[in-house]
Amino acid sequence: MKELTKRQNEVLDVIKDQILKTGMPPTRVELAKILGFRSANAAEEHLKALARKGAIEILAGTSRGIRLLGEHQHNEKAHQDGLPLIGQVAAGEPILAQQHIETYYDVDPALFHPSADFLLRVQGESMKDIGIMDGDLLAVHKTQDIKNGQVVIARVEDDVTVKRFYREGRQVILKAENNDFGPIKIDLAYQSFDIEGIAVGVIRTADWM
C-alpha cells in the first residue's frame, strides 16, 4: 500500500473509529461534519484517494459503502460474553448502538459461514417461506459486499427490514418470501438505503433456550 498523507490518515482514523463505535462506516456527510470539510464531495475525494492507495474499497450503491483493506481491517467480532442480540432499532441510529442491544448470547460466531457479527430478533412473517419466523434470532454477518438473491438486513429510510436483495441499475428491489407481502422498490437516486449485513443462519429461540 502506498504511503498516506497526514490528512488521509486522519480520514482513515475516523472511518476506523466510527466502525468500532457504531458497527458501520460513516457516510460522506458524517465524514465531512467530523473532519470539518465544506461538503460531502470533499469527503468523497479523500475516500477516492484512499481507495487508489489500497487502504479502503468503495462499494457502489450505498451511502456507507466503505470497506477497510489489508492491515487496516478490523476484527470486529463478538463481545467477550457472546454475540449481541439486537431488538428494536430506533430510526436513524446505528444498528449496533448500545441502546439496541438486549443481551448477549453465548454462541460461537464461527458456527456460521461467514462468521456472525450479531443476532437480530425477527419481527413479522415476511420471510417465513424460507424458515425465518417471527421471533427467531437471525445471525448476521456485517458486510456491504452483496450479490443478487442474498437475504440481507437493509435500512430503507429509517426502517430496518430483512428481505431478499436484487439490484437493477439504480433500483433496488427487496423481495419477501411470503406471497402476502409485495416487493419493496427503492430508487437509489432519491431514497436513503443502506445494507447492514447478510443473513448467515437462524436460531429458533424455543430450541435455543
UniProtKB/Swiss-Prot annotation:
The keyword Manganese does not apply. SUPFAM superfamilies: LexA/Signal peptidase, Winged helix' DNA-binding domain. One of its GO terms (molecular function) is DNA binding. The active site is at S126 (for autocatalytic cleavage activity), K163 (for autocatalytic cleavage activity). InterPro entries: LexA, LexA-like, LexA/Signal_pep-like_sf, LexA_DNA-bd_dom, LexA_repressor, Peptidase_S24_LexA, Peptidase_S24_S26A/B/C, WH-like_DNA-bd_sf. Its EC number is 3.4.21.88. It catalyses: Hydrolysis of Ala-|-Gly bond in repressor LexA. It comes from the Bacteria. The record marks A91, G92 as: Cleavage. Keywords: Autocatalytic cleavage, DNA damage, DNA repair, DNA replication, DNA-binding, Hydrolase, Repressor, SOS response, Transcription, Transcription regulation. The keyword Phosphoprotein does not apply. It is an enzyme of class 3 (hydrolase). Pfam families: LexA_DNA_bind, Peptidase_S24. Residues 28-48 bind DNA. GO terms for biological process: DNA repair; DNA replication; negative regulation of DNA-templated transcription; proteolysis; SOS response. Belongs to the peptidase S24 family. Homodimer. Represses a number of genes involved in the response to DNA damage (SOS response), including recA and lexA. In the presence of single-stranded DNA, RecA interacts with LexA causing an autocatalytic cleavage which disrupts the DNA-binding part of LexA, leading to derepression of the SOS regulon and eventually DNA repair. This is LexA repressor. It comes from Psychromonas ingrahamii (strain DSM 17664 / CCUG 51855 / 37). The gene is lexA.
